[in-house]
């Protein structure tokens, strides 16, 4: 079985539904940590919300709805500096989009993290 994280996803040829669901769960976790100030925006960008990550996910034919969340996550720095009163609302909106999308994926039946 495969181990999954945002970094290991880049070594895959394509993304299946399980991989996309795990990616979404990671993204929602990053947004939750960002919203509660457990991580900085810079950390979130280093982990997930960068044009590089977006490009790699697009190359892997990632679900366009996930790509949209990542793209909007890349815009958080601009929002924080230009319209700071909207910053946390945008994080919450992205988190809610991610949660709604996670629910559309099928149940994960395998223990993919074990070898």
Per-region residue spans from a language model:
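Acidic, Ser/Pro/Thr-rich low-complexity regulatory regions
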Residues: 1-115
């Amino acid at each position: 079985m495969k181990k999954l994280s945002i970094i290991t996803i880049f070594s895959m040829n394509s993304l299946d539904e399980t991989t996309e669901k795990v990616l979404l769960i990671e993204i929602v976790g990053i947004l939750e940590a960002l919203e509660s100030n457990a991580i900085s925006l810079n950390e979130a960008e280093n982990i997930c919300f960068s044009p590089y990550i977006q490009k790699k996910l697009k190359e892997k034919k990632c679900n366009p709805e996930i790509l949209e969340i990542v793209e909007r996550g890349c815009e958080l720095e601009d929002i924080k500096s230009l319209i700071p009163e909207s910053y946390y609302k945008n994080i919450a909106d992205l988190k809610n989009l991610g949660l709604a999308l996670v629910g559309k994926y099928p149940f994960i039946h395998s223990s993919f993290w074990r070898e």
